[in-house]
Amino acid sequence: MHICCANCSLYPLQTLFAKNIDIKGLWLNPNIHPYTEYQMRLESVQKLQKVWNLDIEYVDHYGLKEFLRAVVNKEDDRCVFCYTMRLEETARTAKKMKLDGFTTSLLVSPYQKFDKIIAVGQEMGKRYGIPFYEEDFRQGWKIGINLSKDLGLYRQKYCGCIYSEMERYLNKQRAKS
């Protein structure tokens, strides 16, 4: 399971564990900016890993330059690029490890483009010959929020890239005006 952050992973992990599905996590998020935010989210996943004794592989790569080069002048399509970048590597890793399938914690967030995530996951599954596990975890979003507070996990305020940070705070500022 691609883990975008500790908070979003909580409900999907609980749900899949309840179905007796073994989970191998993958931290791969070069889309998270700035570096201090990237580090806080990484440390939060590491904290969750210790508390819940999770099996997680880390691809610790801060990819600001690569991300910006890929999305410049295509900012409106950046989310699809971001999903593709992460789910492609997740599918490739799952196939290499001979796992039964792959999924992502992104499927829990009501703020993500759910249908696009599903489409990218299916495409990567076909490309790498490994099933993409689809489940709508969004009904557990608030459960995950409460659990993350109980566990004392860092709670981010925007999706990840500097564009989403700008949109979040710019919209908040506009709402005050």
Language-model segments: residues:
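Nucleotide-activated chemistry modules centered on ATP-dependent adenylation/adenylyltransferase
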Residues: 1-177
